[in-house]
UniProtKB/Swiss-Prot annotation:
Protein name per UniProt: Heat-shock protein cognate (HSC) co-chaperone sgt12
Recorded GO MF terms: identical protein binding; molecular adaptor activity; protein serine/threonine phosphatase activity
Main location, first listed in the record: cytoplasm
GO BP annotation list: post-translational protein targeting to endoplasmic reticulum membrane; response to heat
Species per Swiss-Prot/TrEMBL record: Aspergillus fumigatus (strain ATCC MYA-4609 / CBS 101355 / FGSC A1100 / Af293)
Length: 341
């Protein structure tokens, strides 16, 4: 026999589900799904669930958090939609249309109040007040549940605040409610991209382009191309190239992204280490200051261009080329442009 004290306490996820069930039962009474004769039984059931799971159905904030502005019925309809599998025997077009319509979650109709909340959420987004925007969109969704525009907007707010999984959930629900709403596909693509689900992001952008028609918008096509590059890079196991590296900086790179030191060598007279009066490079690199500079050059090859333009280093190179001696290291490193490397 299991003692009551040995029973684990309900998890937060279980508590949220309990609140969602209580809310569903309450809504079923209000919308006429259940009759007034069932009211007493439903109230007893709600009380038992609340006591057992240690939740308070009168806590509006907790109920809102549990449902995210949705209803248990709409959430379940999405689950049914996503788990739907094609039957072994193809159904007629009419039967398929009826099945899709029956399982399609219904978008709540916007009201002046919900649209006002959406506009306030948009303003909060413009001010980068993402938490406030999320709350305002959630309030709008409580008035018009499963509205794809409100869901898509909240997905954008979640993405902006770094909550990519929640963004993907909202955007995916919006695409189920209205598969033709291209903005929801775009935000689903972004959320999946930020979660490193590049194949999922590619699928979302492709669906978005299909929904837009005419080959899709430039923004949607850019998202798709970026995602395709990520997939190719992942398949190659290579790091992505930096988009902001210009041709001049790129030309200063050797194989594997290492800086091309041929320009430095030519500036020093074209001689190898130790030849024609040139000091052995190994002795130079044993100097910790130069070793640090070399590490910085390898991590940021663009610095090589600045190094080539340094007049003090250029004078040193000319002296080397004429067989001159090594400069004083302390005076060389006192040059701010070198000391900061």
């Amino acid at each position: 026999m299991v003692r009551l004290s040995d029973t684990p306490a309900p998890t937060e996820s279980q508590k949220r589900l309990a609140l969602a069930i209580i809310d569903f039962l309450n809504s079923s009474l209000k919308d006429g799904t259940l009759t007034a004769d069932d009211a007493e039984s439903i109230e007893i059931a709600q009380s038992c669930i609340a006591d057992t799971f240690k939740v308070d159905p009168s806590d509006e904030a907790a109920v809102k958090d549990a449902l995210g502005g949705q209803s248990l019925a709409s959430i379940f309809s999405v689950y049914e939609k996503l788990r739907q599998k094609p039957s072994k025997e193809p159904a007629s077009a009419g039967a398929q249309a009826q099945s899709t319509e029956a399982q399609q979650p219904k978008a709540g109709a916007p009201t002046p109040e919900s649209d006002k909340l959406k506009s306030e959420g948009n303003a909060a987004m413009a001010r980068k007040e993402y938490s406030k925007a999320i709350d305002l969109y959630t309030q709008a969704l409580s008035i018009a549940p499963a509205n794809p525009i409100y869901l898509s907007n909240r997905a954008a707010a979640y993405s902006a605040s770094g909550q990519h999984e929640k963004a993907a959930e909202d955007a995916e629900l919006a695409t189920v409610v209205d598969p033709k709403y291209s903005k929801a596909w775009s935000r689903l693509g972004l959320a999946r991209f930020d979660m490193a689900d590049y194949k999922g992001a590619k699928e979302a952008y492709e669906k978005g382009i299909e929904a837009e028609g005419n080959g899709g918008s430039d923004a949607m096509k850019r998202g798709l191309e970026t995602t395709k590059r990520k997939i190719e890079e992942a398949n190659r196991g290579a790091e992505p190239p930096a988009d902001d590296v210009d041709d001049a900086a790129g030309a200063s790179r050797g194989a594997g992204g290492m800086p091309d030191l041929s320009s430095l060598a030519s500036m020093l007279g074209g001689r190898g280490g130790g030849g024609g009066g040139m000091p052995d490079l190994s002795s130079i690199m044993s100097n910790p200051m130069f070793a640090s500079m070399a590490q910085n050059l390898m991590s940021n090859p663009d610095m090589l261009n600045n190094l080539m333009n340094n007049p003090q280093l250029r004078q040193m190179a000319e002296n080397f080329g004429r067989g001159g001696g090594m400069p004083d290291m302390s005076s060389l490193m006192s040059d701010p442009s070198l000391a900061e490397m």
